[in-house]
Design a protein with these regions (language model features):
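Active-site beta-strand/loop signature of hydrolases that rely on acidic residues for catalysis
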Residues: 54-56, 83-107, 180, 206-236, ...
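Second-shell loop/turn segments in exported
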Residues: 38-41, 68-74, 91-99, 125, ...
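Sec-dependent bacterial lipoprotein signal peptides
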Residues: 1-4
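Active-site-proximal beta-strand/loop segments in catalytic clefts of secreted hydrolases
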Residues: 54-57, 98-101, 125-129, 140-141, ...
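Metal-dependent phosphoester/phosphodiester hydrolase catalytic core
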Residues: 65, 174-202
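Metal-dependent phosphoester-hydrolase catalytic domains
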Residues: 7-38, 211-220, 227-308
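N-terminal, active-site-proximal structural segment of metallo-dependent hydrolase catalytic domains
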Residues: 6-115, 125-128, 204-205
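Structured beta-strand-rich core segments of catalytic domains in phosphoester-bond hydrolases
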Residues: 100-179, 185
């Protein structure tokens, strides 16, 4: 069976851990879902705020193949170098990522970005039932973590959890607060244990339930790797609540993922916004980042959005 990059099993981290200053954990208090605790003080900074969403393609330690040999290794250095170059050129103020490993992996990425001129001191790591691949968000501004959303569901009489959970934070930006939701839905790889499409629909339904609870939020941005196309049931369950941004690259192409084995280009990565936040989006400057370095860094392309 062919294993895609999204499903190979990794191991523990090899990076050296550092202090946890600037990192936050989930708060499990029973606060209202639309009212995370306020920040201690307002922030100052320049507008527009630059946001990037990026699937990093296994920024973690795992079994990798080289000349028919298997060994436990971290993400190849040439891929990391390209990835860091892409991000430092984009200079995001807020960065949402998929396929990050442990806290040590997140620390490593944070340190490399800072060493190359991109300081994002605040971070949050989010996980679901997948013990290896997680989501994270890094920010120039302080992060407030919302109460953890429900990620439990039943399918075919069995209990499951969303593989990577729902990342839910609020960030006080210079133009006003924005609530960021991040997801990484089940991949399209077939598995014998369950129907992967049905699994993805259940995950999308949980996300839609969470969006419904938030209601008409004044500034909500949902991003991530949805592993599905825009007319799919999973995506349509989201567009009932939020509007997708029609991002394109400089050649007006919309694909965000390349599957080299089958030579297939797909749009799996999206950014959705609430009606009121859409008015703050600079559509002319928002786009899909495309460059030779992007192809070296990951099988996904990053999404770039400017918020006023």
């Amino acid at each position: 069976m062919l294993l895609t990059g999204c499903d190979k099993r990794p191991a523990t981290e090899t990076w050296k851990p550092r202090s946890t200053s600037g990192q936050v954990e989930y708060e499990l208090a029973s606060a209202p879902i639309d009212a995370p605790r306020p920040l201690d003080h307002p922030v100052t900074g320049k507008l527009p705020v630059r946001f990037v969403s990026y699937n990093l393609r296994n920024y973690l330690t795992m079994v990798r193949h080289d000349d028919d040999k298997k060994s436990m290794r971290s993400k190849p250095e040439k891929e990391i170098t390209a990835l860091v170059s892409v991000l430092t050129k984009a200079q995001p103020d807020v960065l949402g990522v998929c396929e990050i490993g442990t806290q040590a992996d997140l620390d490593n990425l944070q340190d490399r970005l800072e060493a190359n001129g991109l300081k994002l001191p605040h971070s949050h790591l989010c996980s679901g039932s997948d013990p290896y691949r997680r989501q994270a968000i890094l920010s120039r501004y302080p992060i407030t973590v919302s109460p953890k959303p429900n990620i439990n569901f039943q399918m075919d009489g069995r209990n499951f959890q969303m593989f990577r959970g729902i990342l839910d934070v609020s960030i006080q930006l210079p133009g006003g607060p924005v609530r960021f939701l991040g997801v990484h839905l089940k991949s399209k790889r077939k598995v014998p244990e369950y129907d992967e499409e049905l699994m993805r629909r259940h995950e999308a339904y949980l996300l839609a339930q969470h969006l419904a609870k938030l209601g008409d939020h004044p500034a909500l941005l949902l991003y991530g790797d949805f592993n599905d196309t825009k007319r799919s049931t999973s995506i349509r369950s989201i567009t009932k609540h939020l509007k997708p941004l029609n991002l394109k690259d400089k050649d007006l192409s919309t694909w965000t993922h390349y599957w080299e084995y089958q030579d297939v280009y797909s749009r799996f990565d999206y950014i959705f916004v609430s009606k009121r936040l859409e008015k703050r989006i600079n559509h002319a400057k928002s786009h899909i980042i495309s460059s030779p370095e992007v192809r070296k860094a990951s099988d996904h392309r990053p999404l770039y959005v400017e918020i006023n």
